[in-house]
Amino acid sequence: MLRTITARRFGPLWSSVTTSKRTMSSGGAAKEPLVLTEEVGSKGVITLNRPKALNAINLDMVRMIYGAMKSWETSKSLVIVKSVGEKAFCAGGDVRAITESGNVDLAKSFFSTEYGLNALIGNYRPTYIAFIDGITMGGGVGLSVHGKYRIATERTMFAMPETAIGLFPDVGGGYFLPRLEGKLGLYLGLTGFRLKGRDVFKAGVATHYVESKNLPALEQQLLATTSSTEVEKVLERFSEKRDAGVEFVLEKQRKQIDQCFGAPTVEEILKRLEKDGSEWAQSTLKLLHKMSPTSLVVTQKQLELGAKMDLKTCLRMEYRLAVHHAIDSDFKEGVRALLIDRDQKPRWQPASLAEVDPARVEKFFGPLPDGSELVFEDDPASPTNKANL
């Protein structure tokens, strides 16, 4: 089958996007595009091509992915998203660039564009399949969990560690985390606990588990399918069964997670963990005490509200949170401590849960100024503050 490889801009709307063709740097070396697109008849393949940065996505990359997906929305039956390299599918969004710039408009542009892509994935007409082979965090989660199929491998490492940098599990985290079994999603969202390999599948984050060595053959067979039923059969043929292999890493803690994280407030969660007293509870307490107290409270409320929302409504809520966080001291401090200086010693303000002001938390969820709310491209009567796509 002829495979036509392209990596292109998508009209004037994408004029700021990295050029699709290979360009020559001043040293004469070819510069690879950060996103590659490939058309195989009625199928499409999108490849993240930033392996040295663990395929972390920046604004240009988000725009390129969105542009490719929109151009294929009515012409393709199936789209595969994967990445270059063995370490990472996508390690997240480039939050360091956002905080270092100090530019709130850049933050708004990035988050609105990224959330617009998340919404598109969640409502995409073609069958969407993400090969989450390697590190999958933050923005990489947003590129995968809202699609119909997510393929984990033995190299997959899933985490939503945003509370450690003074943020919250965004990219629709408020939608998909509370829909995991029991209180597992809240546990993952508050602690940033890392799931690896088969456990990503057993937790329900991935829909299938395939050994990485078999991904090329899986891709080839998927690109040769002619119906959604055939796609299902191919995936089932390659995938392990969910109950196969070793026990889920958190299986023995399921009841404790549901009991402790079923508390109505973060403070009560900590009290239940203290009362539990087990080795797991003690290590979880130690982990939570490292996180931004404000982020913990915001995240608990975010997931509580998101459990009752559709994806787009949840993303609108998260955009409010993101804009408010962009000017908040904890986000800047968390990025500094973990990603810039890397001293691992963030100075949170406030420093304890007891000091978190409920009124301040409510402001994070409050409306933005007129004309500043997130509006998606396909929303009726869209005003001028449409997602910056």
Where are these regions (language model features)?
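Conserved CoA-thioester-binding segment of acyl-CoA-metabolizing enzymes
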Residues: L2-K82, A119, P380, L389
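A structural preference for short, pocket-lining loop segments at secondary-structure junctions
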Residues: G41, I46-N49, M64-G102, G116-F131, ...
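Hydrophobic/aromatic residues within transmembrane alpha-helices
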Residues: V81, D94, L143-S144, D199-V200, ...
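Glycine-rich beta-to-alpha active-site loop
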Residues: I121-I165, P169, Y187-G197, H208
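Contiguous mid-protein beta-loop-alpha structural module that forms a pocket-lining wall or clamp
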Residues: G172-E230
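Amphipathic alpha-helical blocks and their helix-capping loop/short-beta junctions
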Residues: V205-M291, S295
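Substrate-recognition/cap regions that form aromatic- and gly/pro-loop-enriched pockets
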Residues: L270-D276, W280-R320, A326, D330
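C-terminal amphipathic alpha-helical interaction region
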Residues: L321, S329, E333-L389
